[in-house]
């Protein structure tokens, strides 16, 4: 986790390449 594949908000908190998923 921490990429932004499932949940952008979650990944944003983790600290990864979070990209707002459609």
Curated annotation (Swiss-Prot):
Domain of life of the organism encoding this protein: Eukaryota
Keyword Nucleotide-binding: no
Transmembrane segments: none
UniProt subcellular location: Nucleus matrix
GO molecular function: DNA binding; zinc ion binding
Feature: compositional bias, Polar residues: 11-22
Cellular component terms (Gene Ontology): nuclear matrix
Keywords: Activator, DNA-binding, Metal-binding, Nucleus, Repeat, Transcription, Transcription regulation, Zinc, Zinc-finger
UniProt keyword GTP-binding present: no
Region ranges (Disordered): 1-22
Function: Probable transcriptional activator which may play a role in neuronal differentiation. Able to bind DNA and activate expression in vitro.
Family designation: Belongs to the AKAP95 family.
Name of the protein described by the UniProt record: Zinc finger protein 326
Organism: Rattus norvegicus (Rat)
Name of the gene: Znf326
């Amino acid at each position: 986790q921490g990429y932004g594949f499932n949940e952008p908000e979650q990944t944003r908190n983790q600290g990864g390449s979070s990209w707002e998923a459609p």
